[in-house]
């Protein structure tokens, strides 16, 4: 008899759990697993403060040490999803690993936006920029397709156990990044410098890295540097709960307004 594919569901709680997310999790856990799948310790959660890099790193460690799961499904607590969408994402990961080499991550799509609601929603996908470590937001993409990208946000993705183990073997947190919370440490390092221009340059670099390489992009940079590939299924859309529920319809309306002279592709 074929062994089931074992799945662990992981979540990081930075402050609070959104009600849309709570309802999604309840519906998921109240249902049985599809044929060919089994839970590996069910839900693994990590409570953390604003340091998401630390929380996500602990989640990978708990996944490896506390479960025998083949994959870890990471869905942030401000996402809304259905059980069907959850298992379709897992199934996409499983099939992608069978059909392609070196697939480490498969993700769905969610969007980021400021206020008001249609203030330029952007998908959580990036392609490689001109230089290593630089990324360009992917604004438009083929609908309902599996595409390869350079980086994704960590809001909804499936990570292979071998990816987590790779970083555990190196004893590093792959989500670690330079952030503004590191300024006190940075100030200690440069306190002895007497060149104001050098100090200003270093501070600007720290802010740039914090803006451009948060914990999710830092993670993806290390994943691809290790030889793993990152795929996204653009048909799997996860609404992002802000002060409103930001979904694919909002994104498509914004794209059509942004490019009114182009034929709609989404």
Task: Please name every model-derived segment.
Residues 24-27, 58, 88, 218:
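Alpha-helical elements of Rossmann-like donor-binding domains used by nucleotide-donor carbohydrate transfer enzymes
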Residues 68-69, 98-103, 228:
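Short, high-confidence coil segments that cap the C-terminus of an alpha-helix
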Residues 57-71:
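Active-site nucleotide-sugar/metal-binding loop of Leloir-type enzymes
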Residues 52-56, 216:
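Conserved donor sugar-nucleotide recognition element shared by glycan-biosynthetic enzymes
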Residues 82-196:
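Conserved catalytic core of nucleotide-sugar-dependent glycosyltransferases
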Residues 69-80:
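Short beta-strand-to-loop acidic/aromatic patch adjacent to the donor-nucleotide binding site
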Residues 2, 171-266:
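C-terminal catalytic/acceptor-binding lobe
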Residues 1-50:
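N-proximal low-complexity "stem/linker" segments adjacent to membrane-targeting elements
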């Amino acid at each position: 008899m074929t062994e089931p594919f074992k799945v662990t569901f992981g979540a990081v709680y930075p402050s609070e759990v959104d009600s849309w997310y709570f309802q999604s999790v309840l519906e998921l856990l109240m249902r049985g697993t599809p044929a060919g799948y089994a839970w590996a310790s069910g839900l693994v959660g990590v409570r953390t403060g604003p340091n998401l890099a630390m929380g996500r790193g602990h989640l990978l460690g708990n996944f490896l040490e506390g479960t025998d799961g083949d994959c870890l499904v990471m869905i942030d607590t401000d996402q809304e999803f259905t059980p069907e969408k959850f298992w379709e994402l897992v199934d996409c990961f499983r099939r992608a690993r069978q059909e392609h080499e070196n697939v480490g991550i498969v993700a769905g799509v969610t969007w980021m936006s400021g206020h008001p609601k249609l203030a330029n929603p952007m998908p959580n996908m990036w392609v490689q920029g001109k230089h290593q470590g630089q990324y360009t937001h992917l604004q438009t993409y083929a609908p309902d397709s599996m595409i390869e990208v350079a980086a994704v946000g960590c809001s909804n993705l499936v990570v292979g156990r071998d990816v987590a183990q790779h970083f555990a073997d190196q004893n590093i947190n792959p989500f670690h990044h330079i952030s503004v919370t590191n300024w006190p440490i940075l100030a200690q390092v440069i306190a002895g410098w007497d060149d104001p221009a050098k100090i200003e340059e270093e501070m600007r670099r720290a802010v740039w890295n914090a803006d451009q390489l948060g914990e999710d992009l830092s993670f993806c940079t290390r994943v691809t540097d290790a030889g793993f590939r990152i795929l996204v299924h653009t048909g799997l859309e996860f609404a992002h709960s802000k002060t409103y529920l930001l979904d694919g319809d909002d994104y498509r309306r914004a794209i059509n307004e942004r490019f009114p002279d182009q034929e709609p592709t989404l």
